[in-house]
Amino acid sequence: MPSKRKRNPLQYQTSGSLDEETNQRSAFPQIDNNSASESLEYDIPLDGLDYLATVREEARKLVPFVAARREPETRETIPLRKLEIEAGKKSFDPFLRYLLNIIDKEGERLEQYMESSSLDASILPKNLQQWRVYIEHKAPCWAILAVVDLATVLEILESLSSWLEKDAIDLQSQWIFCFCYKLPELLNGEDISTLRSVLKSLRSTHTSFPALQMSASALQAVLVYRYGQKDLFQT
């Protein structure tokens, strides 16, 4: 059995004296310098305190260096940073806001009409089939928009993509735009999901008709800015 190495007792304390270079106390136990020098002569592995003594001894032999002072950045020295903007978002954003502004203003006019006029719900079409015929032949009017409820608006919008006819698409597009006036500031998740599906259908149907795509953009503006559907910027 190999004999154990005799080691000199080390004198240490848990809080060392101030270091001349850093003006701070050592975080490790303070070891006597003579003991450290003796430990360096051994070829066998050092124990924990001997290792610390070795590191201290080597650190004292290192050539000191001076770090260059970094000048604070000024307006002239800060490099220009390229803004990362999604493709098309920069130019498309003002257009959606413009449409939303129209919707907000017309929505206010509709509310004023509702407050100042006597409303008659009996003039409304009775079912979806009657709504389909009505929308194909008549332009939107305040009297109808004032009395139609949100549930009916959502139901019509959900059906409109399958009702679209080339001969009636201009009138149908007007109704889509005007139905946006009826959309409230707050809407539950299920109804928002319905509107997202409507937008997707409009974007994939009759894409060569500017009036229809304009109305789809109006719905998109409401979804993006009023209901926080930011992923629809480029839909």
UniProtKB/Swiss-Prot annotation:
Residue positions where Phosphoserine is found in the record: S117, S118
Biased composition (Polar residues): 24-34
Keyword Nucleus: yes
UniProt entry keywords in alphabetical sequence: mRNA processing, mRNA splicing, Nucleus, Phosphoprotein
Disulfide bonds: none
Annotated localization: Nucleus
A single GO cellular-component term on record: cytosol
Annotated spans, Disordered: 1-34
A biological-process GO annotation: spliceosomal snRNP assembly
Main location as per UniProt: nucleus
Domain of life: Eukaryota
Pfam families: SIP1
Gene3D superfamilies membership: 1.20.58.1070
InterPro entries listed in its UniProt record: Gemin2/Brr1 (IPR035426)
Subunit structure: Part of the core SMN complex at least composed of smn1, yip11/gem2, gem6, gem7 and gem8. Interacts with smn1; the interaction is direct.
Entry similarity comment: Belongs to the gemin-2 family.
Protein's job: The SMN complex catalyzes the assembly of small nuclear ribonucleoproteins (snRNPs), the building blocks of the spliceosome, and thereby plays an important role in the splicing of cellular pre-mRNAs. Most spliceosomal snRNPs contain a common set of Sm proteins smb1, smd1, smd2, smd3, sme1, smf1 and smg1 that assemble in a heptameric protein ring on the Sm site of the small nuclear RNA to form the core snRNP. In the cytosol, the Sm proteins smd1, smd2, sme1, smf1 and smg1 (5Sm) are trapped in an inactive 6S pICln-Sm complex by the chaperone saf5.
Protein name per its UniProtKB record: SMN complex subunit yip11/gem2
Species: Schizosaccharomyces pombe (strain 972 / ATCC 24843) (Fission yeast)
Gene: yip11
